[in-house]
A protein has these predicted regions:
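Bacterial N-terminal signal peptides
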Residues: 1-11
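A general "mature secreted/periplasmic domain" signal
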Residues: 14-109
Length: 109
């Protein structure tokens, strides 16, 4: 019995493994483009890790993000955004781009 529990615990350990920045999905952002993130269910909580990004939640399943200013280098990490709903949590690294065509305008989670 105890051996079975130990095997089960070892097998699910990867499911609850810690995620690092390197493993996170990255969204490119630009101060001239609003990035809209839409969840499939109501968003309960949003955290933006720095004050370099402005954000709001105009409706219960949507957030809008935009860099506050444009004095950044290409590829610079401006923030990590965490989105929590009833059933899941998503995290994205927001990377600055000077090229408007690379900025993400819409993301569904």
């Amino acid at each position: 019995m105890f051996a079975a529990i130990a095997v089960f615990a070892a097998s699910i350990q990867g499911v609850f493994a810690q995620q690092t920045y390197e493993e996170m999905e990255r969204l490119t952002v630009n101060e001239q483009v609003t990035t809209v993130i839409t969840a499939t269910e109501p968003i309960r909580f949003v955290d933006i890790s720095t004050d370099k990004i402005a954000g709001d939640q105009p409706i219960n399943n949507t957030i809008r993000l935009k860099p506050k200013e444009g004095a950044h280098e290409d590829g610079e990490v401006l923030a990590i955004v965490t989105i929590v709903t009833e059933r899941y949590r998503s995290q994205y690294a927001l990377l600055y781009t000077t090229r408007l065509q690379e900025a993400v305008t819409d993301k569904v989670v």
